Amino acid sequence: MDKEKLDVKIEYCNYAMDSSVENMYVNKVWVQCENENCLKWRLLSSEDSAKVDHDEPWYCFMNTDSRYNNCSISEEDFPEESQLHQCGFKIVYSQLPLGSLVLVKLQNWPSWPGILCPDRFKGKYVTYDPDGNVEEYHIEFLGDPHSRSWIKATFVGHYSITLKPEKCKNKKKWYKSALQEACLLYGYSHEQRLEMCCLSKLQDKSETHDKVAALVKKRKQTSKNNIEKKKPKFRKRKRKAILKCSFENVYSDDALSKENRVVCETEVLLKELEQMLQQALQPTATPDESEEGHGEEINMGEKLSKCSPEAPAGSLFENHYEEDYLVIDGIKLKAGECIEDITNKFKEIDALMSEF
């Protein structure tokens, strides 16, 4: 078979398929059986579809075509959506009611149960294409935790109680909890299901605006309070530093004044001590040289008598001089009250120095 004949045959097949699709589906309507154990799609003629009450459920036994009027009969071959597009057709989905329990087909995920509920931001649960047909649904997915998203109507179908769990590679616990929740909500009414949609509850726009404004105001007040709180802390620390510095200055001033006082008192005591020593030296000092020499001899004699180990301890003369005089560096000093006063002065000086 040459190439020209093959191209002609392919074109003929495409034309035959297009014409068959057109003849089969023009002026006809697909209706889904609402039996939860069936959910098959049946093709109705335009006359039969006109008799369908959209407010009432429809089942397979209501089909006038005897070939497909039982739930046990398999579904008719349904063309791919791309084939319909090539012929200029498109699938139009009827709008599912709010609060419906649905099953969503997701890529790389098992069919996931959810509830049709309003988007709290848009305030609606369905969007339409330019022709006025259903395009997307807002769905809150079941499971722990809930999640929400806008899904194309192509991937949204009725939930069936006979659904068998599919293989789930990831989030197995999440998928299991979603199926359990779907079984629980299956017997609920549409209104009760909407109450379970915690992520999608409608809020008044004015109320939302007020909440946002209150939140912004609260944040401003919080930031303002934080600034006000920070300022006193800074000032308090600054004041503490100033007080500490002042205290140290006062303390240092007190220490200096105390030091000056001790030094002055010590100087006074030293002067008094010097006067006492001068008074103690007066009896031994004589104006003429002969007396000075004589005094020196006496002093030397006293030195020898005191330093000599041979001198008797019980000598009255030495005892008299020991009681009345004290020899320091060869100088004879008056004893008695003068020596006692000098000792007391030294004690006072020691006390002042220890205090300093």
Swiss-Prot record:
Changing W30L: Loss of histone H3K4me3 binding. GO terms for cellular component: nucleus. Changing F78 to S/I/P/D/E/H/R/Q: Little effect on histone H3K4me3 binding. A zinc finger (CW-type) spans 24-79. This is Zinc finger CW-type PWWP domain protein 2. Residues 98-162 form the PWWP domain. Keywords: Metal-binding, Zinc, Zinc-finger. Changing W30P: Loss of histone H3K4me3 binding. Histone methylation reader which binds to non-methylated (H3K4me0), monomethylated (H3K4me1), dimethylated (H3K4me2) and trimethylated (H3K4me3) 'Lys-4' on histone H3. The order of binding preference is H3K4me3 > H3K4me2 > H3K4me1 > H3K4me0. It comes from Homo sapiens.
